[in-house]
């Protein structure tokens, strides 16, 4: 019989931490952090940790324990979270896991997921094994890493955007650890994980807010962070990096947190104009992160949950918590508590709400195409358009490319190029241009 586990997911700023606290208070439990930035000791403001006051005397685990110069893998989280969950179960309580690092949660909930299995594969390499002779490429620039990946695994290279440094490096790490093309390993693990099993009897709450409300809310939160010592923390992080005499990698460890890299231009050219520009960049990055989290939930996490629900309805339940209107917060908390009570103690489930049904419908669409065409993983380059850096515009997936081709931006670019070419021909015809 599966032991119970409650999980609260959601985008940044949607109120998932507050919901987890209220559930823990109501049912006398503890909260386990599943945010990859909040595991680090210190830097409470830039990583948006819940304050001591906001915790309301609820014990929070796996938070603020890792030193800034360390990294924390998926298998390490899986191991530590499982240990804490067992400990809470031994006290007769139902653990509540909360966080926005969804690959942590996916690995914890489901056995043999692709991400978890591949991380274990690379972590299990013998310490005495000599490094790969080409592993120095991991410290090179993204274009060099991508060129190397194209040589050893062109299939994998086609799936990553040229500027997705983290994924390109990860693919190379897999190759250097295993000696095999990462696409081959991903394919094998995907076949194995297609039948992934639940580890726990799982109740999953998705705290969400309408984008028109969430985005301004996120902007205000960044402004609030500014008044709570954000700049001092960024200065402290920069000083730590300088004291250790290394250049921070913005794609790894604590250095990934939103705000650090965005404010680097201000240190190089301090002025009010540059500061305000950096602040705006941080707000944009925060909004983009929220969008990517929502996409992950809708297209990956929720479909996996629904697939399991189809197999075993009594083992997993997905429920939404709408935080758009904070005037209805107490009502939403009460709804979540009723769902918790019915699912874990009454052995039943409350009928899905309208928000639940809407989420399920979108997830069903994603579920039907989850293992769809390879063209959705292929890289497409537009020969007409340039991105913000002046590089050829690149997207992943045929559908995304078709959307771009039909966009006003693409059509305008093509029209202007055509008009310029026609103008040059006319000028040549009248002898102005040779």
Swiss-Prot record:
Substrate binds at residues 12-17. Residues 211-233 are annotated as: Interaction with isopentenylpyrophosphate transferase. InterPro entries: Dimethylallyltransferase, IPT, P-loop_NTPase. It is found in: Mitochondrion; Cytoplasm; Nucleus. ATP binds at residues 10-17. One of its GO terms (molecular function) is ATP binding. It is an enzyme of class 2 (transferase). Residues 35-38, 166-170, 256-258, 281-299, 291-298 are annotated as: Interaction with substrate tRNA. Its EC number is 2.5.1.75. Gene3D superfamilies: 1.10.20.140, Classic Zinc Finger, P-loop containing nucleotide triphosphate hydrolases. It holds the Pfam family IPPT. SUPFAM superfamilies: P-loop containing nucleoside triphosphate hydrolases. GO terms for cellular component: cytosol; mitochondrion; nucleolus. Belongs to the IPP transferase family. This is tRNA dimethylallyltransferase.
């Amino acid at each position: 019989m599966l032991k119970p586990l409650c999980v609260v997911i959601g985008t940044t700023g949607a109120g998932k931490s507050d919901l987890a606290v209220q559930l823990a208070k109501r049912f006398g439990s503890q909260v386990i952090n599943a945010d990859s930035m909040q595991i680090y000791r210190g830097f409470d403001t830039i990583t948006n940790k819940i304050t001591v006051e906001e915790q309301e005397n609820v014990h929070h685990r796996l938070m603020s324990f890792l030193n800034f110069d360390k990294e924390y893998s998926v298998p390490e989280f899986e191991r530590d979270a499982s240990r804490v969950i067992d400990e809470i179960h031994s006290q007769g309580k139902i653990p509540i896991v909360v966080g926005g690092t969804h690959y942590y949660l996916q690995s914890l909930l489901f056995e043999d997921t692709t991400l978890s299995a591949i991380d274990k594969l690379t972590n299990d390499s013998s310490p005495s094994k000599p490094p790969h002779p080409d592993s120095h490429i991991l410290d090179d620039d993204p274009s060099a890493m991508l060129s190397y990946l194209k040589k050893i695994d062109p299939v994998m290279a086609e799936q990553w955007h040229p500027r997705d440094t983290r994924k390109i490096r990860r693919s190379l790490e897999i190759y250097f650890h295993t000696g095999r093309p990462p696409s081959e390993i991903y394919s094998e693990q995907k076949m194995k994980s297609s039948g992934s099993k639940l580890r726990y009897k799982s109740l999953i709450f998705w705290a969400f807010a309408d984008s028109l409300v969430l985005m301004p809310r996120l902007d205000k939160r960044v402004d609030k962070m500014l008044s709570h010592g954000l700049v001092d923390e960024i200065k402290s992080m920069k000083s730590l990096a300088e004291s250790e005499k290394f250049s921070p990698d913005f794609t790894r460890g604590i250095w990934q947190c939103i705000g650090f890299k965005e404010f680097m231009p201000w240190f190089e050219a301090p002025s009010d104009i540059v500061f305000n520009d950096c602040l705006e960049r941080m707000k944009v990055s925060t909004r983009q992160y929220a969008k990517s989290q929502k996409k992950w939930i809708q297209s990956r996490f929720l479909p996996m949950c629904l697939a399991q629900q189809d197999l075993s309805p009594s083992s997993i339940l997905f429920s939404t918590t709408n935080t758009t209107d904070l005037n209805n917060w107490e009502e939403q908390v009460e709804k979540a508590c009723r769902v918790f009570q019915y699912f874990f103690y009454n052995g039943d489930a409350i009928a899905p709400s309208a928000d639940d049904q809407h989420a399920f419908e979108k997830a069903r669409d994603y579920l039907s195409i989850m293992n769809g065409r390879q063209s959705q993983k292929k890289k497409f380059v537009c020969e007409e358009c340039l991105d913000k850096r002046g590089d050829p515009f690149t997207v992943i997936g045929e559908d995304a490319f078709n959307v771009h081709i039909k966009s006003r931006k693409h059509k305008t670019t093509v029209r202007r190029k055509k008009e310029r070419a026609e103008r040059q021909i006319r000028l040549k015809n009248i002898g102005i241009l040779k």
